[in-house]
Amino acid sequence: MFYLVTMCIPEKYSKECVKMMEESASKGFPISCIAGRDRYDCIERVGRKEADIVAVDPEDMYLAAKNKLAEKAGYNIIEQVRTKEEPDAIYRYEAVAVIHKDLDINNVQGLKGLKSCHTGVGRNVGYKIPITKLTAMGVLTDINNPEYSARENELRALSTLFDKGCLVGTWSPDPAINQRLKETYNNMCALCEKPNVCDYPDIYSGYEGALRCLAHNGGDVAWTKVIYVKRFFGLPVGVTPAVPTSENPADFRYFCPDGSKVPIDTDTKPCTWAARPWQGYMTNGADANNAEAIQRELTQLGQLGENEKANWWEDLLLLNEKTLAVAAPPVSPEEHLQSAKYMDVIERNSGAPERDARWCVWDKNALNKCRSLARAAFSRDARPRFDCILEKDETACLKAVRDNGADITVIDGGSVKRAINEYNAKPIVAETYGQGSTKFSERPALAVIKSGSSINGLGDFKNKLSCHSGYVGDFAGYYAPAFTLKLNSLIKEPSEIDTFFSKSCAPGAPLDSKSCQLCVGINTGDDQTKEATKCKPTNAEYYNGGKGALRCLKDGKGDVAFLPLTALQQLDNEKDAAGKLEDYVLVCPNGGQAPINEWERCNLGLEPPRIIVSSAGKSPNALEELKHGILAASTLYSKNPDLLHLFGAWGDKPNVLFKDDVKELISIDSTWDKWNSWADIQRDYGSH
């Protein structure tokens, strides 16, 4: 039976999706695909039966199992991504504790005072699993002390339980906090190759490194996974035969959660603490016939991708040369996780009372995004858990933070001075935009023309064609040129910018206005799609954003482009189709042209970033915990936007929660002193 399978894929892989459809169709088993915003959105779409299948990690399965992402969704895992080395293994890997055979220990309480070797902080078998299981057994104690952040409570507990250890990695995404934690709990770095660094690369870190630490650096117990134990001791692994090694497995034992010891050999089953389930393909309520047809086509698709060495094979199917898709009896995501004893590892927290970071917003779209972030980040171990609160406006949120009805809110940089003075706010985290922004994350707004243009001052813009990075709400594309033209008496009111130019493309403007006439909509597709996406303030509009405004200028649609410096400094000639840096010069507000690198004397104003504020009444530890949770989520999703599109347009809405061009979030320290000048910018430019 043939069944046309529709796969949902994150938008970032749209091109691979088209390629996959073409290649599968040419082989006689066409697979269709639709683009979701990210994997989270795809899980919702499969739940609503807009698509049949989505490729997922165990953490995504948790989202499907635990959050009502779609009414009446009957999610099932119908294929698993397994390794060719162990195609019959039930789990991707199993977590074990390994000890010296003659270690005097007969229960988990005996771990007290031992020297412990870990893969690395925040990792599964070397950190999350032992912490989760040892806490449940009452071995790790005082792990929910309200004086400390969730991460510090874990590190304190490990540091107290073990005499020494090696636990490398980034203990906090904030460098100052990272340093303090490593100094405070330095016994957990003592067994590392470089105790004073306690970070990768380190020969005693990772799965094999933990065993090396046990065998050769004085460790008593190593937390690692079965496959690496087998490799370390030269035992056969799946289809790979035994190999000679200088390590002797007879000198070591698996240490079991019940306190017993098990030999490390080819005949004895290891005792495990938990397992990480395989990744897989998740469908929604596929009946037996459909499930079989889908499995058959996915297996064919995996083979085709491998033969073609296609990009889509890796990005869309989560496969590589070491893995393959294996059909498995359909199982609910919850069962898939529980059979591996992995559910509590994902849900790991430091016990009651649970502390949520309550995030205040005043817009329905921001609430939707905040809730998605809260669910997704929790499944991927960002702590504290976020909770989202809707108030009527910025002032109400600042009051809520002041009065302990909320913990954090995101405000414009220009509002921080008022927030500090009137609501006892404390700025803790800022947006950052990468190359082309200042030390304090400001983005210079520029008027850009082509090299060789005869335009020599603001007055020359009258009745010209203009390209804007955005409309109302956009600093470089709207507020900065409007303010500058008004300051120079070329317009009386900012709204007159719409008629000052003869035609423009300012995505987000009313569709029937002059400000949309130069916009073109999506770059591919039919006229109907182009029309539907024209002048939208999202990447569907080819001329949207800073790089879009440059494309509009390069294509000869406009005479001038208003955009932030970041768009120029981050120009990728191949990818952006927006020309080269040397193709452009600046027009200065005081007249004349200037090269791009003289932007400091030739800009239309500096745009402040958005800032996350909390309450100055909170303890340093409470503020540190909030920073940790926010930065952990930012680090994760700035690197993996396919999991959750935290930075960029949210649906068809721009600048929801954060500005679209954010690269990641950074910690604010005492050197930040821009609040007064930013308040002046907000007042003068009307950019609020």
List where the protein language model places each region.
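N-terminal hydrophobic or amphipathic helices and topogenic motifs
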Residues: 1-51, 56-59, 81-92, 103, ...
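Solvent-exposed loop/turn segments at secondary-structure junctions
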Residues: 60-63, 102-105, 121-125, 227-231, ...
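Extended serine/threonine-enriched, polar tracts that run as long, contiguous segments within proteins
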Residues: 203-204, 208-220, 229, 260-265, ...
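Short, hydrophobic alpha-helical packing/hinge segments within bilobed ligand-binding/sensory domains
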Residues: 41-43, 209-213, 396-400, 548-552
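A conserved helix-loop-strand patch within extracytoplasmic ligand-binding domains
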Residues: 77-158, 431-506
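Ligand-binding "clamshell"
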Residues: 63-86, 232-270, 418-436, 570-601
